[in-house]
């Protein structure tokens, strides 16, 4: 078996992985793009979601005890005390960004295909409604740029100098169904997804 673990992230709905910045007065949040203007899920975010999923599998007894810490490291802060964790560890795995397939990325990056790149994005708006009157509250309109559904690819491999425990790929695969959404506003319906391992031929 290869030392790496490849997976697909199938986005089922609009999703938003943002920069925390807006675009002036029109949009309050814009999508983070790579160097050619394409959307992606940052590896750091994906790693955090996988870490939580493995933690659940560990708590339920489906994977080896201590696997979450070995693969993904310890928290920077102790959740119980709020103090820095002692000692903090980075974990054994490196998680790449989840991006569009290489061939599609190369095609979309062509200068003549700018209109297709723009077609990957939409603008959505929301507002707060007064529960008594049923009327929109003043100055509550918010605009967000989102990305259309698509399938992304990511790769997970050992960090240089680290040796994960034998069988880590199969144990990690057990946790993938527990990641149900990615990006911002996951609890409000954005970013529903299915994570699946890429089977080697």
Regions found by a protein language model. Name each.
Residues 129, 134-135:
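Intrinsically disordered, low-complexity linker/loop segments enriched in Gly/Pro
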């Amino acid at each position: 078996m290869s030392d790496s673990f490849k997976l697909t992230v199938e986005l089922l709905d609009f999703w938003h992985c943002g920069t925390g910045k807006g675009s002036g007065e029109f949009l309050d949040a814009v999508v983070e793009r790579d160097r050619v203007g394409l959307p992606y899920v940052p590896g750091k975010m994906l790693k955090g979601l996988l870490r939580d999923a493995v933690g659940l599998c560990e708590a339920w007894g489906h994977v080896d005890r201590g696997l979450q810490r070995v693969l993904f490291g310890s928290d920077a802060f102790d959740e119980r005390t709020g103090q820095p964790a002692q000692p903090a560890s980075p974990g054994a795995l490196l998680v790449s960004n989840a991006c569009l397939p290489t061939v599609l990325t190369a095609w979309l990056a062509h200068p003549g295909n700018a209109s297709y790149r723009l077609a990957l994005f939409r603008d959505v708006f929301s507002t707060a409604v007064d529960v008594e009157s049923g009327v929109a509250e003043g100055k509550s309109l918010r605009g967000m740029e989102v990305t259309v559904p698509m399938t992304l690819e990511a790769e997970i491999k050992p960090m240089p100098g680290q040796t994960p425990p034998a069988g880590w790929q199969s144990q990690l695969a057990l946790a993938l169904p527990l990641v149900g959404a990615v990006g911002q506003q996951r609890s409000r319906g954005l970013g529903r997804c299915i994570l699946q391992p890429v089977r080697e031929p």
